[in-house]
Structure formats: structure tokens, C-alpha cells
Regions:
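Pepsin/retropepsin-fold aspartyl endopeptidases
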Residues: 2-314
Length: 314
């Protein structure tokens, strides 16, 4: 459960400028097939309508960084879901033991998973009725359309119809998550985890040391982040240029640095690594996550909207 939210928004960092892109990579003709689900954007995160045991729709956060789906304690109480065993939930700020509830079926459009035992977390900390994790996404292709505020769920066993205009990056799967190894920050190689549930991009201490050593740049700011478990994570944030993902080079990217427990979970404490949050992803027009086939596709916005954010390196 790796969702993070900014806790002290008025004392943190200046967000990145609106994104940019080269005309050659603008995709105005991409045909999206599959099950399109209405979504809304609260701040930078994406929410979709989900049915729980045929009840709903209920508003769930889409979190590609979470290994299992979650329901809020309020929704669990409202639907009188049977209580199960207590489990230990790993958040960005630490671990917490929470009760689980039995869910017969979670339905996203025409896709359904269940039965599952879902951790029940505080609705106040989730900011939603629940959270869709990779247990529901493992065989899916997820298209996040930040312009239309919609999410398209597809069966990734079906062939993907490419237009030739998307930027394709191949990822690895580790503990279910997509990890991009073709990434760097200021020419330092990093492992990049796609995390749609986090509002901010997070770097580990190994990356901070590689970039700055023991010094603290004058424009680096102390911030606090709130995890879905309700715990607070202290971090340092700074805007950086020359962040590369595949052939894409991003500028003015805000990265918060902290020793978050999930880095250890993925074996990424010693190697420089980042979690790519929705603050970064939402600067693109569309982002497609294909979990089965380990593919991430980025579609740009018009050049006039992304002039100072993204360029391509051939």
C-alpha cells in the first residue's frame, strides 16, 4: 500500500511546470479499445468507479504500486463485509497491522476479481472508498487518460494495436510492480517503479547520495508525506532536470528523498531508485501500463503545452 499524499502543501516545493513534447510524438489518432471507465482526478491521482459485491459504484483509487486491493473501513462497515484475519500492511512510511474484510467480487467495468481478503484502511487516509492494486491489474492493460480523466481496462492477453506514435519503454516485473531500468537522473542510472497511487515522485537515499553527497542544496526543502496507513514520512524535496525514462528526457521534476520501507521491499536500498508518482505521470496525455507484457507507453500532449517539460533523445 504505497500511496503517498503531500501533508504540508503550503510549505513544500513548487510543482513542475505544465509538460511539453515534440510534435513528432504527438498521438492524435490513438484508438482505445476495451472497457473505458469514467474516472476523476483529485489533485493528480486517478479514481475509478468500482462495484463491491454488486454494490456501487464506489470511488476507488488506482494504485499500481500497491500489491493488493483495499477497501475503506467506512465502506466495509456500510456493506457489512465479514471481518477476517489481521494482516501487516506496508506503507511508504512504515508498517501497520489492520483487519481484513471478505470481498466476494470487485468489478471494474467488465473485469472482475474475487473472492479476496482486502485490508480495511481509514477512509480519511485513503481519500477514497478503496484502492485497486496489482492483484486486480496483473493480467490487465491499464490506459490512464489524463485529458479525458478516464481509465480504460483491457485484457492484456489481447494484442495491443500500436499507432507508431507512442513512446514504448520495456519494464521488469518485481513483486508484481513494473520497474523501468532504462532510466536515469542527471545521467545517474536508476531503477524506476511506476506508482500511480503516489502524489509525488520519491527517490531513495542512495540516489540522493549519488546526486548531492552529504550536502544539502539551498533550494532543497523539508516536507512531510502522509501514507495510506496514516503514518507520516519526513522527506527532502527538490526540482531536478535531466530525468530520463527510455528516450524521454524530463525537466523540472520534483523529487522527494526519503528512506521509505518499500525500497527495501524491492531490494532497492543500495541502488539509486525512484518511485514515479502521478505528479510526473499526469504531465503526459496518456500513460498505458501493461502488467502482463511488462510494457509502459507514454503519449505526449501538444508541444505548446509541454514546451518546458519533455524532450526526446534519439
Amino acid at each position: 500500500m504505497f500511496m503517498l499524499a503531500l501533508l504540508l502543501a503550503n510549505a513544500t516545493v513548487t510543482p513542475p511546470s505544465p509538460p511539453l513534447v515534440a510534435p513528432a510524438v504527438i498521438d492524435n489518432s490513438l484508438e482505445i479499445t476495451g472497457d473505458s471507465v469514467a474516472a476523476e482526478q483529485l489533485k493528480k491521482r486517478m479514481f475509478i468507479d468500482v462495484k463491491v459485491n454488486d454494490s456501487g459504484p464506489h470511488r476507488f483509487l488506482v494504485d499500481s504500486g500497491a500489491d493488493r486491493s483495499v477497501v475503506s473501513d467506512g465502506l466495509a462497515s456500510q456493506l457489512k463485509l465479514p471481518v477476517g484475519e489481521t494482516v501487516r500492511v506496508q506503507g511508504m512510511a512504515g508498517q501497520r497491522e489492520v483487519a481484513t474484510v471478505e470481498v466476494a467480487a470487485l468489478t471494474i467495468g467488465t473485469s472482475e476479481i474475487g473472492p479476496i481478503m482486502a485490508p480495511a484502511l481509514s477512509a480519511r487516509h485513503l481519500g477514497a472508498d478503496g484502492l485497486i492494486g496489482i492483484d486486480a491489474l496483473a493480467d490487465q492493460r491499464l490506459m490512464l487518460d489524463f485529458d479525458k480523466r478516464s481509465i480504460t481496462v483491457q485484457d492484456s492477453r489481447q494484442p495491443y494495436v500500436a499507432t507508431g506514435n507512442e513512446i514504448l519503454v520495456t519494464a521488469r516485473r518485481r513483486k508484481g510492480q513494473l520497474i523501468i531500468t532504462q532510466a536515469s537522473v542527471d545521467r545517474r542510472e536508476v531503477a524506476a517503479v511506476i506508482d500511480t497511487g503516489s502524489e509525488i515522485t520519491l527517490g531513495n537515499s542512495a540516489l540522493r547520495r549519488r546526486l548531492f553527497g552529504a550536502s544539502k542544496p539551498k533550494d532543497m526543502r523539508d516536507i512531510e508525506l502522509l501514507s495510506v496507513t496514516g503514518q507520516v514520512l519526513k522527506a527532502e524535496a527538490i526540482a531536478l532536470n535531466n530525468v530520463q525514462i527510455g528516450s524521454l528526457v524530463l525537466s523540472n521534476v520534483v523529487i522527494a528523498f526519503a528512506d521509505a520501507p518499500p525500497f527495501a521491499l524491492f531490494g532497492l536500498t543500495e541502488r539509486p531508485a525512484i518511485f514515479l508518482g502521478s505528479d510526473l505521470l499526469s504531465n503526459f496525455r496518456r500513460v498505458s501500463l501493461d502488467f502482463r507484457n511488462r510494457k509502459v507507453r507514454f503519449t505526449m500532449r501538444p508541444e505548446t503545452e509541454q514546451r518546458d517539460f519533455v524532450t526526446r533523445r534519439f
